[in-house]
Swiss-Prot record:
GO cellular component term, pick one: plasma membrane
PROSITE patterns xrefs: ABC_TRANSPORTER_1, ABC_TRANSPORTER_2, MGLA, RBSA
Primary localization class, coarse: membrane
Family: Belongs to the ABC transporter superfamily. Carbohydrate importer 2 (CUT2) (TC 3.A.1.2) family.
Annotated protein name in UniProt: Putative ribose/galactose/methyl galactoside import ATP-binding protein 1
Amino acid sequence: MARAERSVLLRLENISKEFPGVKALSNVHFDLRSGEVHAVCGENGAGKSTLMKIISGVYQPSEGTILHKGEKVQYASPLQSEAAGIAIIHQELNLVPHLSVAENIYLAREPRRGFLVDRKKLRLDAKRCLDRLGVDINPDQLVRSLSVAQCQMVEIAKALSLDAEVLIMDEPTSSLTEQETRLLFKVIRDLKASGVGIVYISHRLDEMAEIVDRVTILRDGRYISTDDFASITVDDIVTRMVGRSLEDKFPERTSRPTDDILFSVEGLTRNGVFSDVSFSLRRGEILGFAGLMGAGRTEVARAIFGADPLDAGKIVFNGRELSIGSPQDAIEEGIAYLSEDRKSDGLAIKMSVAANTTLANLGEVSNRFGLIDFKKHDDVAKRYVDLLNIRTPSIDQTVRLLSGGNQQKIIIGKWLFRQSRVLFFDEPTRGIDVGAKFAIYKIMDELAAQGIGVILISSELPEILGLTDRIAVFHQGRITGVLETAKTNQEEIMRYASGYGRAAQ
C-alpha cells in the first residue's frame, strides 16, 4: 500500500497529562496510519507509557484531542478502547498461566451455547487466530508451559480476536532470542500487509530498521520530532532522546582491579544444569558472564546466591569457605544478586522507594525494641536517592510507578545499604533507555573503584566488552574460556559461546 493511500487510524493533537505535582505530557502530537509500524522513542520517564495509556483508555488526557478514524473520541477504560479495535501488548505479558491458550485468547468473551461455554467453537476460533499468525501452538496447551515468545504470540492472537486495527507493542523483543525475534518480525510484517497499524516501543534501536516506517521522539514529556525511519540515523535518535550527543556509550574506567582474590568458586555443579564451574573474582574487578541463552550463566549466579541448590563445589569469600543454603545466608555473607526480573524478584513492587531501599537491612533502621525508627529509615532512603540520582517525586512514591532505570537504582541502593561486597548484575540494563544505561554503567564502575567485586551477566556483547576486565564464557553449563577483555572481541567470544574455543585453564 503506497504511503499516500494509507488512511490515518489515530491522531493525537496537543495531548497533555498532569498528575499531582507532575506534568507527564505537554502538548504531544502523534498519528498512526494503517499498515505502518510507528515507533515511539524516548528515555524512561519521557512519557511513552503515559501516552500509550491515554491511547488505550487507562488514562484520560488533561488537555488535547484524540481522533480515531477522523472521529473525536475519549475512552474511559481499556474495555472501551478494545471494543473500538485498539489492543495493547504489555512488556509484562497479561496472561493467566493455569488457563489454556484458547481460554486466554477469549477470556471473558467465550462463545456460549446457552449458559455453557461452547468448547468446540472456542478451540476453533482460537486456532483460526493462531493460524493467521502462522504459529504452531496447541489451543488446548496451558499457558504456563509456553515460552515467552509463544506467550507473546498468544497475546497477538488475542488482539486479532478483538479485530484490532491498532496494536500497541511495548518492548516486544526484550526477552526474546534472535530466532524468536525473527519470527515476531515476520508476524509484524504480515500484520502490516493486512492493514493493521502498529505502535512500537523499544530501546533496541538497532533492530528497528527492519520493521519501523516512522519514529516519533519524546523527551521529558514533550514532543521532539517525527521522521521517516529511513531518513534518520540511530545516533540522531539517541541525541534527540537525551538532548545531548552520547559519543561514549560506556564510562571510562576510573580504576583497575587489584591482584587480591576477593571471591572464587571451584567445581560448582548442579546436576543437569551446569557442571564443574570454576572462576575467581579480584577485588575491584568487573567480571563478565557471556554466553548464549540457556548456557547456565543465571543458573550459576542463582546457585551461588542460595536461590537454587548445588550438588557439588566450593565457594570461597575473603579466604574463607562458605556454606550457603539460602539467599539469607548469601546476604549475611555480603553477596547480592540483582535478578534479570527486577519486578518479580528484586522489588516489593507495591511498596515505597524508602521501604524497598531498607528492606534487606531493617535491623539498621530499627530501635532497641525491634520497631522501625522512621527517621533513620527515611534518612537512609534519602541518602541513596541522592547518591544514585534516583528520579522520584518522593521517597514515599510506589516503586511500580517509576521507570525501569530508577527501579534498578533502588535495587542497587538496597544492596549497598546492606554493605554487600560481591554483586551479581543479571541483565541490569534490559528494558531501560540509553541514558539510564549509562548511569547504571557509571554506578558499576564506582562500585568496582571501592573494591567491590562485580559480576555482569549480559546478552549484549558490546556491554560486556565495554565494561568488564575479564569475561567468563559459558556453553552448555560449562565455562569454556576466561578471556582478557582488552585482548578479545565479539567473534572470539562467540566461538567460545558456541563451544569451539579451547577449554578454560
